[in-house]
Amino acid sequence: MALKGRALYDFHSENKEEISIQQDEDLVIFSETSLDGWLQGQNSRGETGLFPASYVEIVRSGISTNHADYSSSPAGSPGAQVSLYNSPSVASPARSGGGSGFLSNQGSFEEDDDDDWDDWDDGCTVVEEPRAGGLGTNGHPPLNLSYPGAYPSQHMAFRPKPPLERQDSLASAKRGSVVGRNLNRFSCFVRSGVEAFILGDVPMMAKIAETYSIEMGPRGPQWKANPHPFACSVEDPTKQTKFKGIKSYISYKLTPTHAASPVYRRYKHFDWLYNRLLHKFTVISVPHLPEKQATGRFEEDFIEKRKRRLILWMDHMTSHPVLSQYEGFQHFLSCLDDKQWKMGKRRAEKDEMVGASFLLTFQIPTEHQDLQDVEDRVDTFKAFSKKMDDSVLQLSTVASELVRKHVGGFRKEFQKLGSAFQAISHSFQMDPPFCSEALNSAISHTGRTYEAIGEMFAEQPKNDLFQMLDTLSLYQGLLSNFPDIIHLQKGAFAKVKESQRMSDEGRMVQDEADGIRRRCRVVGFALQAEMNHFHQRRELDFKHMMQNYLRQQILFYQRVGQQLEKTLRMYDNL
């Protein structure tokens, strides 16, 4: 039931799931059960959303008001002894296509029914399957949840800190103080587990089976190249049916260069892989999959468009030194046996080296990097990525409008011109004694030529503009990932500065501050390596995009010129 509350302090919302409250403002609280220190309610202006539980007091009828105590809840105060490390049996937050967070309930991995990939329906996606009470946009719970009990605890991944498993060599009893945790437990810095990693709360594994190396290159830190590079083609989209035609889907033939046989995968399989990638690779910009479509998904144009974009997606995946080595990706590309397929799927879903734990797999260079220089470099890339995102959107808008003109306006105008020429030819035939058959035929042919040119304009986007839009769409997705990734590094920088200040004030021993700085270096090297890889791919992809566009434009206008030259010669002997 709803409760009355009063705001103790001012709070200003930072995203659309939160609402602003003012000191002494009367509030309606939907439930006094908090999630990570947040309550949902309504302010005096009628706005519904989330606000910090520690900022309000509950007003109980007939009893003096007391400040609500949430310290006993699993999502208690920032100083509560809980670990944000996600246990492998519970899904951890992942970045969505548009940069927002969510939690995916994996359920039991032992149920064979869940592993029957043929039963997956193209009408829904893995990403769209959070249960009621999962997190919505920006990681907050959906605002339409019913109360009480709107925040089921099974979606949150908490466990006590292992006292002897901290990454610091220093026991917690020797610490003078601890760096404060973020109040906003829904920020991507917290949800990703990077805060826990920076503070040393991610337990070291006894044995880390996978490692990814970062080395110094001519432009700074870079991912060490995949020792076994490969490529993979995506071709032959084929409509398949099952259950005697009740269900239909499109399968794609994938042929990796390092495998003996091709495999056939549905879009739903790509979707599962994409969800695993988001779940695991915290500081890597995972390329977005082509968009889904509820209707018309068996139309030829849509199938061809999805195929083109899956080719680009696959090319980016195989060229990435880290993503291309991921065991789940290799299993996706090579497994032919049904039983082995299900076992590999379960292995990927039980992978412990995800989120914050993934950062333990990095081997970084020994070279010293000044953190201020790294922060300046990140700020430069942040400004660059924002400007590039704006310019990619602008070019995409212009190119899309040009496609519409090719298919509509240009074709119609050339057809009108051709029809007008033919009308002239027909009028010349009205007075037979003075009719010139050769001239009439030439003018009529000119009209038909311009009608054909109109059709050529309508077909031309398939040769140039579509490929441009495909590349721009891929980069819109990649660029949309970077604000969250950069936010992780910014949060790490803030923890370093805070720990150093506390050390200078004598509230933290220097060894612990050094540990935070050391782990911040790991995140910094990883982000710089990802920035470096992005620039390498950007230069290559945009070079190919521009070359293809210009070549196709030249060929197109050469064909138009040939048509006009052929028509012109008809007038030479009149």
Curated annotation (Swiss-Prot):
PTMs per UniProt: Phosphorylated.
Record's subcellular location: Cytoplasm, Cytosol; Membrane; Cytoplasmic vesicle membrane
Domain BAR: 371-574
Membrane topology (UniProt): Peripheral membrane protein
Chain spans, region Disordered: 68-119
Keyword annotations from UniProtKB, A to Z: Cell cycle, Cell division, Cytoplasm, Cytoplasmic vesicle, Endocytosis, Membrane, Mitosis, Phosphoprotein, Protein transport, SH3 domain, Transport
Main location: cytoplasm
Tissues in which the UniProt entry reports expression: Detected in heart and pancreas.
InterPro entries given in the database record: AH/BAR_dom_sf, PX_dom, PX_dom_sf, SH3-like_dom_sf, SH3_domain, SNX33_BAR, Snx9_fam, Sorting_nexin_WASP-bd-dom
Key word Transport present: yes
Keyword Cell membrane: no
GO molecular function: identical protein binding; phosphatidylinositol binding
Recorded family membership: Belongs to the sorting nexin family.
Stated role: Plays a role in the reorganization of the cytoskeleton, endocytosis and cellular vesicle trafficking via its interactions with membranes, WASL, DNM1 and DNM2. Acts both during interphase and at the end of mitotic cell divisions. Required for efficient progress through mitosis and cytokinesis. Required for normal formation of the cleavage furrow at the end of mitosis. Modulates endocytosis of cell-surface proteins, such as APP and PRNP; this then modulates the secretion of APP and PRNP peptides. Promotes membrane tubulation (in vitro). May promote the formation of macropinosomes.
Name of the featured protein: Sorting nexin-33
Organism the protein comes from: Homo sapiens (Human)
